Amino acid sequence: MHRLAAVPGSSSPGDGVLFIEQPAATAVLLTSADTDLTALAGQLDRDPSPLGPGRSLGGLNLAALQHPAVLDHYIRTSLAQSELVIVRLLGGRGHFSYGLEQLKGWAEARPERQLMVLSGTAEE
């Protein structure tokens, strides 16, 4: 669920960009909170298929997707077959505005895709 992989040849030496690839998942939780991912991992340890047979659930910390090129690559590869992306933001939309814009486009590209954005703070 939390595996990070560099794509060979995908970044210039020294630019600090690490492209993220994860196995395809039916639903993906993108969150600012490591505790969300810990809870998700615990649930998956208890029930590896909580969405039913042939359906999977994955997660990633939003901090891994801060660079626009990394986010674009992640959407094109890891989210290509996903049906639901849940984004839990801590600190407001401004911290992930490009990401929200791109994920909105991802959701609008196919009718079976859904995007859910949850605020992790009271003011949002």
Describe every region a protein language model picked out:
Residues M1-E124:
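An N-terminal assembly and electron-transfer interface module characteristic of large anaerobic redox
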